[in-house]
Amino acid sequence: MIGAKTRVAIVGGIGYIGSCFASFIKEQNDKLIVTVIDNNKNNHVIKLLKKIGIEFYFADLLDRHKLTEVIAAIQPDVVFHFAAKTSVSESVHNPLKYFDCNVIGTLNLISAISNLQKPIKLFFASSAAVYGQTTNSYISEEIVITETQATNPYGLSKFLDELILNAVAKNSQLQVVCLRFFNVAGAILPFGNFNGNTTLLIPNLVKAFLKQTPFFLYGNDYATKDGSCIRDYIHVYDICNAHFLLWKWLNDHRQIKFETFNLGSGIGTSNLEVIDIAKKVFYPSRLNLEIRPKRSWDPAILVANVAKAKQTFQFKITRNLKDMISDERNFYENFYNDAY
């Protein structure tokens, strides 16, 4: 049972997944006291959130003093931590930026939460990138991960965060759940991915169809069925619902100190298969596809084994890849430009 007056802090709540989640939980329980913390001053998203009764605090994870002040003012019972640098390619070229924001920033948040000296549930947005290159077709949480597996600094930063959170949770009043996201797509309208520089495949594919600009496919010579990367896609709605289900599950399992779960569909789809589905959504529009060399930091296959989530908190997928692409199209055609 989730109390009506529970105080919720969503860190990184102006971003894509954070803002969708803020909207989702207010829809589930309008009595929750929800506050968003972010260093992004996207006024359009802030206005959308305020319309549904969500407050906004400006704070940067790297400003430890300000972050501590904000957390103390909110006094959250539950914290959802979505804030991070997330571009794999940028992390390869600027690893220090990623360790600074994702690792030091998370440490600062843990410190601010710990200062409250009360029981707090912390849900951390991790990533499938922690698994790096693996020979397993369906990746389970039981796989032993080491720092040498990560194929990029982004994945390594998330792995280090998980290690830190596990160590802290053992001797604190925190209950921590790390959620390893696979490839998130779709929208919960009017919220979606307002990041104009996103590196995610589906938003860029949708924009290429709408604007009739080139779409770059990196690699068609992987050891896969059609030569392109295989990934696991999950709708942002199902990501949000999984967090809500897990929150209710954790309320009934107060002895749990630390857990990890994969969040994906459990279905592998190649980049070329994604393009084929998008062609059907956008028919008769054509795609200007350009093949570029594969990138060294991209694993050939990343697909989730989601058996643990299904068995533990009845996780299920409600939307498919066509839904994700259609929702992204609706978002970019009817809502995206409102922010600019």
From Swiss-Prot:
InterPro entries: Epimerase_deHydtase, NAD(P)-bd_dom_sf, UDP_G4E
Presence of the UniProt keyword Endoplasmic reticulum in the record: no
Cofactor: NAD(+)
Active site: Y154
Keywords linked to the UniProt accession: Carbohydrate metabolism, Galactose metabolism, Isomerase, NAD
Pathway: Carbohydrate metabolism; galactose metabolism
Binding site for substrate: S127, Y154, N183, T199, L200, F216, L217, Y218, R231, R295, S296, W297, D298
Source domain of life: Bacteria
Catalytic activity: UDP-alpha-D-glucose = UDP-alpha-D-galactose
EC category: isomerase
Gene3D superfamilies: NAD(P)-binding Rossmann-like Domain, UDP-galactose 4-epimerase, domain 1
Gene Ontology biological process terms in this record: galactose metabolic process
Family: Belongs to the NAD(P)-dependent epimerase/dehydratase family.
Subunit record text: Homodimer.
Annotated function: Involved in the metabolism of galactose. Catalyzes the conversion of UDP-galactose (UDP-Gal) to UDP-glucose (UDP-Glc) through a mechanism involving the transient reduction of NAD.
Annotated protein name in UniProt: UDP-glucose 4-epimerase
Organism: Mycoplasma genitalium (strain ATCC 33530 / DSM 19775 / NCTC 10195 / G37) (Mycoplasmoides genitalium)
